[in-house]
């Protein structure tokens, strides 16, 4: 699970997920109105401003993929969540900078990056609930992100 926090205002920055990733329903802010000719446009694609995303792997299922190298001591990796971030054509400088003029940074946080705890415990068993709880804490009450339980 990865959480993307985007402080830019008015949907000024947005991205499209790479293959094998899926938005966690109820925990993302969708970028509406991306049309032909807009930066990054791809027919039929969904665009996001921020939120919680899960690696589902090539199966394209609804649950987190279990990565395995089949070899203890080796690492297994997902692909990247997104390759580019686009700026909305209607964005203003004030949408992209704070009150001091500093350009906003998007933050990407890995919430669950391994299936076991190193002692044989299964971290993936409650991963969905745990990741949503952590995303809620990171969101800090961002409108349009999360569930009715205060995300």
Model segments located where?
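Surface-exposed, hydrophilic segments of mature proteins
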Residues: 1-151
């Amino acid at each position: 699970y990865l959480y993307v926090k985007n402080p830019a205002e008015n949907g000024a920055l947005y991205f499209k997920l790479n293959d094998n990733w899926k938005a966690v329903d109820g925990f993302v802010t969708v970028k509406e109105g991306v049309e032909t000719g807009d930066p990054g446009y791809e027919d039929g694609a969904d665009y996001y401003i921020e939120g919680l995303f899960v690696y589902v792997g090539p199966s394209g299922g609804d649950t987190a993929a279990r990565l395995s190298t089949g070899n203890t001591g080796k690492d297994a990796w997902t692909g990247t969540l997104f390759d580019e971030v686009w700026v909305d054509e209607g964005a203003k400088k004030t949408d992209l900078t704070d009150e001091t003029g500093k350009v906003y940074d998007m933050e990407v946080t890995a919430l669950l990056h391994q299936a076991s705890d190193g002692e044989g415990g299964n971290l993936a068993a409650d991963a969905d609930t745990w990741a949503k709880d952590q995303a809620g804490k990171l969101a800090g009450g961002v409108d349009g992100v999360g569930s009715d339980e205060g995300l």
